[in-house]
């Protein structure tokens, strides 16, 4: 099934590429940093990085904003609220909460691929409050219950 994702560039991002899939099998399309020149993020610091795009999703869809694995592995750069969710009724610019978990300052340049966006269908269930839940073999055993 194919859907339409409408993308509008902000006035200051007309020179940046539209989000793009970098391979035939890529689940996420890359997003680009819409910074003026460069932004340096020191270890432990957080910066809000604009992408220069606004999107319109069909109803019952969301965009998940995720870190790029190469930036995380090589520089310690990731997103604080990952995955970030863009709801179908949001029309503002997508901005990224970027943190440097590495040991060295990292410079983000204008037009650099900084995150990826994955589009997913959303199911909104009917919510029913109950007194009991069905039993399972696992029940409430959580964190590490199958071993580490």
Curated annotation (Swiss-Prot):
- GO biological process per UniProt: dUMP biosynthetic process; dUTP catabolic process
Q: Which Pfam families match?
A: dUTPase
Q: Does the keyword Metal-binding apply?
A: yes
Cited PANTHER family: DEOXYURIDINE 5'-TRIPHOSPHATE NUCLEOTIDOHYDROLASE (PTHR11241:SF0)
- Recorded source organism is Caldanaerobacter subterraneus subsp. tengcongensis (strain DSM 15242 / JCM 11007 / NBRC 100824 / MB4) (Thermoanaerobacter tengcongensis)
The protein's name in its UniProt record: Deoxyuridine 5'-triphosphate nucleotidohydrolase
Per its UniProt record, the required cofactor names are: Mg(2+)
User: What Enzyme Commission number(s) appear in the record?
Assistant: 3.6.1.23
Top-level class of the enzyme under EC nomenclature: hydrolase
């Amino acid at each position: 099934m194919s859907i339409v994702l409408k993308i509008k560039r902000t006035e200051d991002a007309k020179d940046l590429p539209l989000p793009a899939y970098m391979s035939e099998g890529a689940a996420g399309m890359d997003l680009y940093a819409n910074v003026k020149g460069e932004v340096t993020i020191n270890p432990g610091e957080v910066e809000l990085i604009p992408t220069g795009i606004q999107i319109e999703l069909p109803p019952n869809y969301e965009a998940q904003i995720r870190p790029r694995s190469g930036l995380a592995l090589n520089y310690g750069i990731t997103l604080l609220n990952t995955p970030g969710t863009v709801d179908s009724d949001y029309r503002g610019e997508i901005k990224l909460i970027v943190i440097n978990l590495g040991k060295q300052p990292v410079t983000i340049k204008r037009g650099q691929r900084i995150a990826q966006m994955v589009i997913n269908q959303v199911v909104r269930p009917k919510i029913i409050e109950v007194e009991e839940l069905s039993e399972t073999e696992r029940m409430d055993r959580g964190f590490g219950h199958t071993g580490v």
